Regions:
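Short, small-residue-biased leader/transition segments that mark boundaries at the very start
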Residues: 3-8
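Catalytic core of non-heme Fe(II) oxygenases with the double-stranded beta-helix
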Residues: 10-89, 97-99, 105-109, 116, ...
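Short secondary-structure boundary segments
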Residues: 1-2, 111-113
Length: 125
């Protein structure tokens, strides 16, 4: 019989995001992706809060998930101002981006991809 197992096939990686750095819109391989917010300085949330009523401003320090398959017009998005301790798990093919911030701080995150694999098993229940 075949069993499904979830595994982290690639090594997790640590991101050190500094002032003015960003991750462009992208997707990952695998079935699920995850990001753990290890250290998100409060300055990033304060910076994001100062522009929330200005619709023509970017989203400093925010993580955005963009719905819709790659190559098509997207149907919507979800933006979040992450904080230390947040964990996000999402479909690996979900487009997402991380916006830059201008505060002189470093945000530390850990990311990894999860693969759903099938394995043969001789065990019987």
């Amino acid at each position: 019989r075949r069993q499904r197992q979830m595994c982290i096939r690639d090594s997790p990686w640590i991101n050190f995001q500094k002032k003015n750095e960003f991750n462009p819109v992208h997707v990952h391989g695998g079935d699920l992706s995850s990001v753990i917010m290890i250290d998100v300085p409060e300055e990033i949330a304060k910076e994001s809060d100062t522009v929330k009523d200005k619709t023509n401003m970017p989203c400093p320090g925010q993580l955005e998930f963009i719905e819709g398959p790659s190559g098509y017009m997207y149907t919507g998005s979800y933006k979040v101002v992450p904080k230390t301790g947040d964990i996000f798990v999402f479909p690996a093919q979900l487009k997402h981006t991380v916006y830059p911030f201008t505060s002189d701080v470093t945000r530390i995150t850990m990311s990894y991809n999860i693969f759903n694999i099938q394995v043969d098993s001789n065990t019987q229940e």
